[in-house]
Amino acid sequence: MKVRPSVRKMCEKCRIIRRHRKVMVICNNPKHKQRQG
């Protein structure tokens, strides 16, 4: 899980979602997991 000031899609399978007021990226590739904060 990467924590970044700006999250973006790294591939076409990445999905941007909001959980508990946090913007997150979920993907089949675990290296692409990101959280904004």
UniProtKB/Swiss-Prot annotation:
Q: Which GO terms describe its cellular component?
A: chloroplast; ribonucleoprotein complex; ribosome
Kindly list the biological process annotations in GO that this record carries: translation
Q: Name one GO molecular function term.
A: structural constituent of ribosome
Extract the InterPro entries matched here.
Answer: Ribosomal_bL36 (IPR000473), Ribosomal_bL36_sp (IPR035977)
What start-end ranges are recorded for coiled-coil regions in this protein?
Answer: none
Assigned keywords, A-Z: Chloroplast, Plastid, Ribonucleoprotein, Ribosomal protein
Where is it located?
Answer: Plastid, Chloroplast
Name the Pfam families on file: Ribosomal_L36
**Entry's HAMAP family?**
Ribosomal_bL36
Task: Write out the similarity annotation.
Answer: Belongs to the bacterial ribosomal protein bL36 family.
Recorded hits in PANTHER family, A to Z, give: 50S RIBOSOMAL PROTEIN L36, CHLOROPLASTIC, LARGE RIBOSOMAL SUBUNIT PROTEIN BL36C
Protein name as annotated: Large ribosomal subunit protein bL36c
Instruction: Write down the species.
Output: Porphyra purpurea (Red seaweed)
Gene name in the database record: rpl36
